[in-house]
């Protein structure tokens, strides 16, 4: 398709040749789709063409895909099929020459404008335009150089990291606004894991210095429903889901599960925070009983779930201490917008 309007081309600049990365820069799977240039990018192409003519997909989508495969930037590529959360959309236009409309002339070298857009489940996180000059024709090496320029931008901006995803989506800032106790009794905060999904939030794990099997997990994640819904019912439903997951795991391990307490009320030491808990024990034919206590609360617009590997008589005071010291982020822009649409 030809479109028109534009001005004379400037003198070609020097274009440093970038080297392909030695190690895998983006250790994830991504969908790859062909797309269309944004209006701003189209205008840049028209302005660069002395004849005001630019051709959509001047570099074919399969050529970009071949370049991505040769450079091995991602763990896996899924062309034209939505299998993964991340998507890479590539749009391209090529300036046309006045004589042949096919390649370069001495006075009119080819220029390409390639726009790379990164999306997560259909939400755009970033867009970057690569302007590249070609001698005589577009070569596979040219295409790799175009891709490498975008990849350098992606690495510099940390596009495929979880913190970038949360910030770009307008999700809660767990790193800056979540306050966790450093210790719970003799348990110490061992690690804090931010899920690569803003709807799953964060998990903090506490370990005991003497008993390696003793674990306390605190998960904080948004309530995926309007806040006008009954809070107590939301907590009960979420706890029931957690208990069902525990039952499934026990069944997979051929273990019998015994529910010691179920949907048992629990409050903090001020009586202002109310939640529910369940205590379970699982036992196999040739193993000792395994205990799990699960506690569910709603603070701000978040569920706070405590999971322990021991009975509630040990877990209750630890949970009450944690509630005393815990502060969760308020409602994020992402969840506010989502709840308005529900």
Question: What are the roles of these predicted feature ranges?
Answer:
Residues 2-4:
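C-terminal motif of bacterial Sec signal peptides marking the signal peptidase cleavage site
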Residues 10-62, 152-205, 210-212, 258, ...:
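N-terminal "mature-domain start" segment
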Residues 50-52, 203-241:
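A short acidic-to-branched-hydrophobic micro-motif
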Residues 70-84:
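Short acidic low-complexity segments
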Residues 84-87, 91-111, 248-293:
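Signature of long, low-cysteine stretches enriched in small and polar/charged residues
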Residues 88-138, 294, 298-299:
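Amphipathic beta-strand/beta-sheet edge segments enriched in Tyr/Trp
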Residues 123-125, 211-214, 286-289, 298-305:
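Coil-to-beta-strand transition motifs
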Residues 132-158, 304-342:
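Surface-exposed amphipathic alpha-helical segments
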